[in-house]
Regions:
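Extracellular/oxidizing-compartment recognition motifs
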Residues: 1-318, 327-328, 344-347, 363-368, ...
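Active-site core of glycosidic bond-cleaving carbohydrate-active enzymes
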Residues: 32, 324-543
Length: 543
């Protein structure tokens, strides 16, 4: 994790080099480094509070010699009054194009930097800050004050993978225009403007509009922003004058609608374009059928994957959270790997989870920031993801690398005394999250524990660890027996809570079949059909 090391990125700049003298210029912004994390408002500067640069250019000549030009305080210059007035990865960007001239040619060798300052050396020491999540008894981890190591980035960079122009335009109020992309996207706009110098353009984003309901009287058809929470998702552009293009560089938004205000000349539809960012550069898997609704569902899944795989697997692309919740990550892993080639992407996530594992063996519920309050349904993600990666790519090295951490986690779970008990260990509230009907947490936790033990036996077998394979097989059998004796009513075959009261939820039957913990699969399957038919063949679970 960033607590222990910082990723360095390599670029091949051969194609940018020209004969003779060359120059290099770099613009710094917050990014993940000093942005707010964990949706707790005060958690800005999460990893560090100073944007800084450590770089070198390695030149290899035809005669085999090489020369290195590195950052230093003598040859490099710094300027802090450029056109970027404000930049936040989640909140947006403010850009004054009138000030752009002072640095437009800053990467050319003939640029005059005589008025610029000499930079100073900044130690790469992490700040120490943490916040407690009220009501859950868990805190986001302190960021240790230490000097991290530098390691090479081994995941593919985020790219622009799709483009889409606005489909409709509507004037909401004088000078306020709403553009509809007719598709949820995650990225930035590219807008062509024709305004006078000094004109201040405000650009906002939304996923949905207020519906025509009494409680929203006067707001219907305008942008609903409540689901963005503290993410203001607003860009500001101050025009230089004439035709100019604004494309934010140091932020990203999740949106379908773009609101542009402050303009005298509303951009045409073809002048409002959205650029989709993603770590998913191409899809190898697809689903096509004769059913239009099913096809659209499959398309939505692909778009959701593109929008939520930006450096890390996030829970949402728009609000102030955008965190790598492990439960979301491992549940979707099988689908993601069938859709796209993401071996390095997921191995990076596994690495972050292992790095954040506690000395006792507990995995984090969130990576790479750590912390959370999910419990077993989230902490087990490493086991699920490692097995999915092995099944997809057959690379035994993935299992070898992460197996010791998984063993440590299983020992931690054994010490917690979770399986085989009706005592609520209060290890986290996240089960079938936000479901219309509640499923007993112990039913879910023990189903997950069975699946963990089952997968660990398979992993140990793949690694040739026969003794450990048998140990995990025995544990899985024990938990499975306990689950069926505790959470299934013998007469009706319906699921029940740990106290013997009726559970009978769609989730309880689905998890029993999916994870293989049910002994009487036929009866459990019949109850799942009954529950699904009763709600019109819809999904009645949470996530």
């Amino acid at each position: 994790s960033a607590v222990d090391y910082i990723f360095s990125i390599n670029y091949d700049i051969t194609g940018l080099m020209k004969p003779g003298r060359n120059g290099i210029g770099v613009t710094l912004a917050s990014g993940w480094w000093s942005e707010a994390q964990t949706f707790v408002v005060k958690n800005f500067n999460y990893f560090g509070d100073k944007e800084s640069l450590l770089a070198k250019v390695v030149m290899k000549y035809e005669d085999g010699s090489r020369e290195v030009f590195g950052t230093n305080t003598e040859d490099w210059k710094y300027f802090g009054e450029g056109p970027y007035l404000f930049s936040s990865y989640f909140a947006g960007e403010q850009y004054d194009a009138r000030r752009a001239e002072v640095y437009e040619t800053y990467s050319l060798p003939e640029f005059d930097d005589s008025t610029w300052e000499k930079p100073v050396v900044v130690d790469t020491v992490m700040i120490e800050e943490f916040c407690t999540m009220p009501g859950f008894g868990r805190s986001w981890p302190a960021v240790h004050e230490q000097k991290p190591e530098y390691i090479g980035e081994y995941d593919a960079p985020v790219r622009i993978v799709d483009r889409r122009t606005a489909k409709t335009r509507k004037e909401l109020f004088p000078g306020v225009y709403l553009y509809d992309l007719e598709q949820e996207m995650a990225g930035v706009p590219r807008i062509t403007l024709h305004e006078k110098a000094g004109t201040k353009i405000i650009i906002r984003y939304a996923e949905v509009l207020y519906p025509d309901l009494p409680e929203y009287a006067g707001k219907e058809g305008t942008m609903m922003l409540e689901n963005y929470r503290d993410a203001t998702s607003t860009d500001v552009y101050i025009c230089r004058g004439g035709e100019e293009v604004f494309q934010p560089k140091f932020t990203f938004h999740g949106y379908r609608y773009i609101e542009i205000s402050g303009v005298e000349h509303a951009p045409e539809l073809e002048e409002v374009e959205s650029l989709q960012y993603s770590s998913v550069t191409e899809f190898h898997g697809s689903l096509t059928s004769s059913h239009k609704l099913l096809n659209r569902f499959a398309e939505n899944v692909s778009w959701s994957q593109k929008c939520n795989f930006i450096n890390i697997p996030t829970d949402c692309p728009q609000r102030n959270e955008r965190m790598g919740w492990a439960g979301d990550t491992h549940i979707f892993c099988h689908t993601a790997l069938n859709n796209s080639s993401l071996k390095k992407f997921y191995e990076r996530n596994l690495q972050a989870m292992r790095d954040l594992q506690t000395p006792e063996g507990q995995y984090p519920e969130i990576a790479p920031v750590g912390g959370g309050f999910g419990g077993i349904t989230y902490e087990c993600a490493s086991i699920f993801m490692a097995w999915e990666l092995y099944g997809q790519y057959g690379d035994i090295r993935t299992l070898e690398k992460f197996y010791p951490g998984m063993q440590k986690y299983m020992d931690y779970m054994k010490d917690k005394g979770l399986p085989g008990t009706k005592v609520n260990p209060a290890i986290g509230p996240l089960g079938d999250w936000l479901a219309p009907e509640e499923t007993d947490l112990l039913l879910l936790w023990n189903a997950f524990y069975y699946k963990e033990a089952d997968l660990m036996s398979r992993i140990a077998g793949a690694l040739g660890r026969t003794e450990e394979q048998h140990q995990y097989e025995a544990l899985a059998a024990k938990v499975k027996k306990f689950w069926n004796e505790t959470f299934v009513l013998p007469d009706s075959g319906k699921t029940c809570n740990a106290d013997g009261t009726l559970c009978d939820t769609q989730c309880s039957y689905a998890i029993a079949l999916s994870y293989g913990v049910a002994e009487d699969r036929k009866r459990i399957g019949e109850h799942l059909i009954r529950k699904t038919r009763a709600i019109g063949y819809t999904v009645g679970t949470g996530f």
